[in-house]
Structures are given as structure tokens and as C-alpha cells.
Swiss-Prot record:
It is found in: Nucleus; Cytoplasm, Perinuclear region. Monoubiquitinated at Lys-15 and Lys-24 during normal S phase, promoting its association with PCNA. Also diubiquitinated at these 2 sites. Following DNA damage, monoubiquitin chains at Lys-15 and Lys-24 are probably extended, leading to disrupt the interaction with PCNA. Polyubiquitinated by the APC/C complex at the mitotic exit, leading to its degradation by the proteasome. One of its GO terms (molecular function) is chromatin binding. GO terms for cellular component: nucleus; perinuclear region of cytoplasm. This is PCNA-associated factor. A motif (KEN box) lies at residues 77-79. Interacts (when monoubiquitinated at Lys-15 and Lys-24) with PCNA. Interacts with isoform 2/p33ING1b of ING1. Interacts with BRCA1. A motif (Initiation motif) lies at residues 84-96. It comes from Rattus norvegicus. Transmembrane segments: none annotated.
Length: 110
């Protein structure tokens, strides 16, 4: 619905104004500059983020550096035959396209 001057009632329609968060006042007299006590608490207290539980690496697990250093020839992969790996179609015999025969059963029933 479009508002026109004919159906305008003063005070009935007010523009919505978004409220703002309160701003910090610089130079506040309540600001405490003594940080010697708070620095000790920061060392002992967990500051946030993802907690990490350090565990020893198992003997069977290889390092990430060894993974990047392996050449493609030396790496053992599940698909060892290059023709079977991937679906690029390289090295495969091309299949001939077989067009579908038109289905006339629907025409006969009508």
C-alpha cells in the first residue's frame, strides 16, 4: 500500500531509529592504572580460544613433512592402475553412442 497525503495522519507514522551502544568515555576518573595485580591473574587464567591437549605421537603415525616429500611414484595408492583411477576417460576405449528408440506405447493408449 502506498502512503499519500490524503491518508497521512500527523504523528501516526514515525521513522524508526536504530539505537546505538553506549560509548566509552575517555579520561574517566574511575579507570584504574594499577595493573600489577591483574597481570598475575592473566598468567594463571585461561584466556580463551581452542584448548589443546598435547599428546605423544604414536609410532605408526608419519609426520606431515614425509607426506609432502613423497614423490607420486613412491607413494602407495589404492588405485595403482592409472586407467582405473579417476573418471577422465584417458586411456580407455571410446564407447559408441546408442540413441534410444522412441517409445510409441504412450501414443497407442491415448
Amino acid at each position: 500500500m502506498v502512503r499519500t497525503k490524503a491518508n497521512y495522519v500527523p504523528g501516526a507514522y514515525r521513522k524508526v531509529v536504530a539505537s546505538q551502544a553506549p560509548r566509552k568515555v575517555l579520561g574517566s576518573s574511575t579507570f584504574v592504572t594499577n595493573s600489577s595485580g591483574s597481570s598475575r591473574k592473566a598468567e594463571n587464567k585461561y584466556a580463551g580460544g581452542n584448548p589443546v591437549c598435547v599428546r605423544p605421537t604414536p609410532k605408526w603415525q608419519k609426520g606431515i613433512g614425509e607426506f609432502f616429500r613423497l614423490s607420486p611414484k613412491d607413494s602407495k595408492k589404492e588405485n595403482q592402475i592409472p586407467e582405473e583411477a579417476g573418471s577422465s576417460g584417458l586411456g580407455k576405449a571410446k564407447r559408441k553412442a546408442c540413441p534410444l528408440q522412441p517409445d510409441h506405447r504412450d501414443d497407442e493408449n491415448e
